[in-house]
């Protein structure tokens, strides 16, 4: 079907209605994930997804997202415009159906969109239902059509407000303050997602503007190189093993597949997968196909060209894990009827996709390596080093496994364990130093709180191979205490081999990093975060990792004692106390370390579940998180300096 024919067919008849909208306001989390920061930002993504669907169909070249001074958000595109003619079944304009009926839209009609994204296809009506007000303006059929809504309800009939030579859709909405915990959109979070979408849709221009403040930020994203540019962006602070990006692209079949990958001298891998522009953070059948193809193609090339050079008395075979060391890869597939596992679309379940991706990627990588033999040789040499490191790590892992409590042996000697054995109720505090560890052991709730003091330096996981990492005493203690096992090779379906990491064996469902509030404490905290992100990311993904927030100051007046967690809180506290009682001196103590607090104070301020503040560690964007750790903990000194200078003012709320 030609673009002209398809454009003519996109009318009210294309809008399919599946169900009503009543439940959205009662249970918003079912539709947008939660009512916190993540759910709020999903409102923007849902509207933008409509514009991206137009781009996928070949009718949209530019999308503009604007944060307005009043707190609302506007999304403007130059697509065909949502149909405005009457819907036969609903007896109302099609645009009103799209805005007021759940699961209504062109994405459910195969003639309008071959593929589309969106949060399980719930559509922009969910945004309407969760907004105090919203208006939509459509340029189509020679006119500008507008309709206004409040809490999802139309306030007037669709009316023509002017003439239009061009086409497009503009949606402006203000989130409902009675539903969301905060309606303050974060520029950086939206910018990262829009950048991602621009990479995934080469040639599409996406503009973001912040008009909430004078001279606010502004970005324009447009990447003609697509995924190849995306890989270079993710890899910019790594030392590349080869400059040329390996690309595989096939748009001719029923399932378009687009892959870009490159190796660096790093020891970590960073593989991002997308289905219809949706980041499938849990992978799925497309990732399984990619992994299988990569391993087979590399081994085939190595064998064919006699590149596996074993040392004397050495038995060596290269696994998928070896070929993933230092790999940065992006996999994007377009699936007409994707089957996602989970409400938030994080794992692809279509069985047929694995074979399709496997075949295309296998053939594509083999062709590339045959045309670029020097790159193939470098990759195989790196994989051989990884295999030898893996062999050494296996011995270290066996030692840890023998020490594991679940293997029937003892826990680390310095661990003060809790008496409860139900992981749901148990907490493990990773505490900096023996002094603070001693106070924590005395002040804790022995029933549910375990303490593991960290005496030596935790190794930097960003710059250490697996065998060196596992020889570090502190890392060994952490792994043994957690009880999950560690690492190991995953098979080509993404499942780990028996005896290696198993999240089901985690002994504590709260792992709390508790360090001093000084530079050394921050460094140790960052090293631990790097370790968990790079080597035990399932713990972060499961929501098990937290940061303790100890106070910086103790403010006292007579027998009254208060704790302040930052300078601003301290100043307000002292000012109030001086006003209330001018005759009694206000005392101030700054805590340089956790060890300066006695067990009672440490319990009251940092460990008591009733009064403490914990920060849950989450990953909003895998690409951004990988880049953050790479900048902070990698070998590029200049990149680290630039990152720190840029983000120094945010350190109180640094979100990794």
Model-derived segments and spans:
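GHKL-family ATPase ATP-binding module
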Residues: 1-14, 21, 43-45, 53-55, ...
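Conserved short strand/loop->alpha-helix "switch" segment adjacent to the catalytic nucleotide/phosphoryl-transfer site
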Residues: 26-45
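Short conserved segment of the HATPase_c
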Residues: 82-104
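C-terminal interaction appendages of subunits in large macromolecular complexes
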Residues: 388-407, 422-427, 438, 442-444, ...
